[in-house]
Curated annotation (Swiss-Prot):
Assigned keywords, A-Z: Biotin biosynthesis, Methyltransferase, S-adenosyl-L-methionine, Transferase
InterPro entries with a match to the protein in the record: BioC, Methyltransf_25, SAM-dependent_MTases_sf
Superkingdom to which the source organism belongs: Bacteria
Function per UniProt: Converts the free carboxyl group of a malonyl-thioester to its methyl ester by transfer of a methyl group from S-adenosyl-L-methionine (SAM). It allows to synthesize pimeloyl-ACP via the fatty acid synthetic pathway.
Disulphide bonds in the chain: none
Organism of provenance: Anoxybacillus flavithermus (strain DSM 21510 / WK1)
Protein's name in the database: Malonyl-[acyl-carrier protein] O-methyltransferase
Pfam families the UniProt entry points to: Methyltransf_25
Length: 259
């Protein structure tokens, strides 16, 4: 299991700052939102959405179930404001909160989250807490990312450390649980994994896209900032993982269903 400590204040700040650019760059996350919608088992009357972001999934939910009572939660106030703009005067309850700290009193037919649980400090405990808030026949449904996400970046970085003869526990980017580890977080969990690939003109463009969605380092740990290592990493990445002049970046998309 990947152990991590998320800097929640830093994460909140970065996602708020990127609320205006998120939708232009979150292509994979949008695909995942549509995939989640297809996995809803029963039409819900009460919905809790965790990590609503700019409201992309929120709008899909509201359009599909306009009579449902929908509560949307996000840790970043900037994201909440953007979501409110997207949904207009839709009767949605908005809550700016950290779901790991929030006390939940209501029961829900559907608890749903898109591309958020990878940022939880204690995902197993949070999943258990949320699963208890389901109504009878209720569903906890979420998408997240697995350990093979950005494997090209991690492979190239490991190569750069090796040729620089650096034997230190340095890393680049976040580390996520495996598909099996996500499934093991709840005894009723069922799941599916798939891979999505995006292409960029350069590694710098790839990094820029991550910055625009706020998905930069918010975890504690030792991150390498040596220019020589980054230069070697970028060279290896562009030599090894290029196709027709574009570098590729793989997303390991995981869908978990608890019913």
């Amino acid at each position: 299991m990947v152990e991590k400590m998320i800097d929640k204040q830093l994460m909140q700040k970065r996602f708020s700052e990127r609320a205006t650019t998120y939708d232009r760059f979150a292509n994979v996350q949008k695909k995942m939102a549509h995939a989640l919608m297809k996995r809803i088992v029963h039409p819900p009357q009460t919905i809790l959405e965790i990590g609503c972001g700019t409201g992309y999934l929120t709008k899909l939910l509201h359009d599909a179930y306009p009579k449902a009572e929908l509560t949307a939660v996000d840790i970043a106030p900037g994201m909440i404001e953007k979501a409110k703009q997207r949904l207009g005067d839709a009767p949605i309850t908005w809550l700016c909160a950290d779901i790991e700290e929030a006390e939940l009193y209501e029961m829900y037919d559907l608890i749903i989250s898109n591309a958020t649980f990878q940022w939880l400090t204690a995902p197993k405990q949070t999943i258990a807490k949320l699963a208890k808030q389901r109504n009878e026949r209720g569903q906890l449904l979420f998408s997240t990312f697995g350990d093979r996400t950005f494997h090209e970046l991690h492979t190239s970085f490991a190569y750069a450390l090796a040729i620089q003869q650096i034997d230190e526990p340095l890393r680049i980017g976040p580390s996520f649980p495996t598909f099996s580890e996500w499934l093991a977080m709840h005894d009723q969990a069922r799941g599916h994994e798939q891979f999505e690939v995006e292409y960029f003109p350069s590694v710098r463009d790839f990094f820029l896209s991550l910055r625009h969605i706020g998905a930069t380092n918010s975890t504690s740990g030792r991150y390498c900032q040596r220019p020589s290592v980054f230069k070697a990493m970028m060279h290896e990445y562009e030599q090894r993982f290029s196709e027709q002049g574009l570098i590729r970046a793989t997303y390991h998309c995981i869908f978990i269903d608890i019913t």
